[in-house]
Amino acid sequence: MLKLIKCELMKLKRKKFIPLVFLSAFLFPVPITFLMATPRMLERYPNKTVLFDGLFNMVMGYGVIFLLPCVIGVIAAMLFFMERDNDTFKNLRTIPVTSTQMIMAKIIVLFIFGVIFCLASMFATVICGSFSMEIHGLAYKLLVAIELGIFITAGTLPVVVLVVFFSRTYIFSILLCVFYSVASLTVETLFGTLPKWLCWLLPIPLTTLWGAGDMVKHGFPLNVAALEKIIPSTFQTVFILGIMAVISISLIDFLYKKSGE
């Protein structure tokens, strides 16, 4: 399996898109840092320590939540379209590797990039915040970044199913992921009116609720009093996303085998 993962990483290494993944980690921290430095925003935070918590929450809770599904979708399209574009499905049948093993290697690579992107976004936030804020609590923020990388990637797998199913162009895959991110953010603005089961059924809003609740437990200045009844525990979040991931991977495996026939 490690050799398969290494092989998939080597394939992506040839793509010029990958360096952009790391650069995109600065896409939200930089403008949000300037936004946090405005007098109107400074009035909301009593000191520079709390201000940094606010910056971290906005970057991870809005920027990463929006951008990472798009990044995962594009990388997934690259991974799953390579064999189709190069017409190598027949060649793959001659090697002693099952399609399920190949699928798992590709999925693991998606999770690796999901975690890397979140860690890069976290470090970008630290770098930007260090100029005007007091940096603290890095151990917890590091843990949250890793968890968000795993959770958001798992929550994006249903979209990967659609990417593999339609098997269209990269542009179509990007548009599909952008629509998914926008739809998720739209749902998040309706948390107060939507039923609990619907909020938990949608992966990205579920992750957002978990992140907000977990950050509040660790002293972040977030007003989530109106959402207390629908905030899931870590166990509930892992359980729900785990079921979604298993179903999605099974569907991806089925569709991938079918496309190779």
Model-derived features: where do they sit?
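Aromatic- and glycine-rich beta-strand/loop motifs that create alpha-glucan
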Residues: 1-26
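Alpha-helical transmembrane segments of multi-pass membrane transporters/permeases
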Residues: 20, 167-182, 186
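Secretory targeting signals
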Residues: 24-74, 104-170, 227, 231-234
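Terminal transmembrane helical anchor/hairpin motif
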Residues: 38-55, 174, 182-258
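Transmembrane alpha-helical segments in integral membrane proteins
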Residues: 68-84, 89, 159-171, 240-258
